[in-house]
Amino acid sequence: INGCDEGIVVEFDFDKDFPPAPDGTPAREDFFTDMPSKCAVGNILYSWNYAYNSDLLKSTPKTLKDFFNTKRFPGKRAIYKSALTNLEIALAADGVKMGKGGEFIYKKLEDPAYVDRAMNKIKALCEDPNGGCVFWSAGAQPPELLMSGEVVMATGWNGRFFNAAVGEGAPIVQVWDGQGLDYEYFALVKGGPNQADAMKALAMMTNTEMLAGSAKYI
């Protein structure tokens, strides 16, 4: 975003720089439109959510609040080792609204008091004798921790959970309440020695066939 504002990376003209979809839909309408800037073209859209091992729980978790409910759902939880997404799910589970606007989570997190509130929620979970936390850093870890029985619930990426459940037959069930959408995208540095070829490569990497093919691996 800063690079775009400072003119370091190229601002795309989507209908000129990228091909239309096979059905003729212009690129400007075909791409996910909520990119962070006009200098970004997305290649992956995925969810941060949580999942559970259905063999280890007697009841069915359905909400973010259930992730923190160790009385009804005892057992350890796996959470990301960074504050990323942890603050959001903690506040959402504590009753703060999700979405856009002054009364919603990201606006509230500008206030240190809400950061403390989220951290206290996480700390309580990790120190709960009926709960406890295992921290993960690699995307493969959450389903592995669930499958091994080390944890009963884990935050993670929807594609990893899906692969474990469908591809490996693991008893892993995803919960979508409070999911956070995330994406990855490309940018093109302005004024490079091979900018025309780089733009062609970028258009090829983000065409419909290539992006659809990435679903085999995500």
Residue ranges, per PLM feature:
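Extracytoplasmic ligand-binding site segments that recognize negatively charged/polar headgroups
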Residues: I1-P143
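A ligand-binding cleft/hinge motif common to bilobed small-molecule-binding domains
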Residues: N2, A154-P171
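Periplasmic-binding protein-like
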Residues: Y46, R72-T85, V115-L125, V166-K190, M204-I218
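A bilobed periplasmic-binding-protein/Venus flytrap-type ligand-binding module shared by bacterial periplasmic
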Residues: N49-L56, L91-A92, Y183-D197, G213-K216
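Short amphipathic alpha-helical coupling segments at ligand-binding clamshell hinges
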Residues: T63, R117, P193-M205, G213-S214
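Loop/turn elements at helix/coil->beta-strand transitions in domains of secreted/extracellular proteins
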Residues: F73-K76, N130-G131, G149-V152, G169-I172, ...
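Short, hydrophobic alpha-helical packing/hinge segments within bilobed ligand-binding/sensory domains
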Residues: P142-L145, A198, L211
